[in-house]
Amino acid sequence: MNLPLLATEGFGLNLNLFETNVLNWAVVVFGLYKFLPSFLGKMLQKRREGILLELKDAEDRLLKATQALEKAKTDLSLAEEKASQIKADSLKRSESIRMESEKKAIEEMARIKQSAISDESSEASRAISQLRKEAVELAIKKALDSLPNRLDQTTQENLVTQSINNIEMN
């Protein structure tokens, strides 16, 4: 029954199994039903195992990254504590250096002041010594100038004798 399908004839249903390829379709569907699950199952199982392995690897990396992050946070807090300790120590050290510098400056100023006072007193001592020397020289000169007028022969003899006696006693 090979009837041509014409546009005028309308829609028709072909019930001949050999002409419609229903048997071919049945064989293909049965083959797919029978062999495809094992073939696709193996492929899907391999893919599933690969995905699970990648997930496990990603979880391991996440765990390691989390541990590294915690360690880094701990190290950061330790470093911050150490930095604050170093800062506090440096502030104490700078304060002690400043105090020591001030103390040395005060001591140096006192030493300079004492030196100035000492120089002043030694200068005064020198001036007094110079004045005494000049006064003694002036007194000796005056005495020598007035001595010839005051000394007569007997006084001169008495003075010489007394000087000799003083020398002999010593």
Swiss-Prot record:
One of its GO terms (molecular function) is proton-transporting ATP synthase activity, rotational mechanism. InterPro entries: ATP_synth_b/b'su_bac/chlpt. GO terms for cellular component: plasma membrane-derived thylakoid membrane; proton-transporting ATP synthase complex. It is a single-pass membrane protein. Belongs to the ATPase B chain family. F-type ATPases have 2 components, F(1) - the catalytic core - and F(0) - the membrane proton channel. F(1) has five subunits: alpha(3), beta(3), gamma(1), delta(1), epsilon(1). F(0) has four main subunits: a(1), b(1), b'(1) and c(10-14). The alpha and beta chains form an alternating ring which encloses part of the gamma chain. F(1) is attached to F(0) by a central stalk formed by the gamma and epsilon chains, while a peripheral stalk is formed by the delta, b and b' chains. The keyword Manganese does not apply. Coiled coil: none annotated. The gene is atpF. The keyword Thylakoid applies. This is ATP synthase subunit b. Keywords: ATP synthesis, CF(0), Hydrogen ion transport, Ion transport, Membrane, Thylakoid, Transmembrane, Transmembrane helix, Transport. It is found in: Cellular thylakoid membrane. Its main location: membrane. PANTHER family: ATP SYNTHASE SUBUNIT B, CHLOROPLASTIC. It comes from the Bacteria. Pfam families: ATP-synt_B.
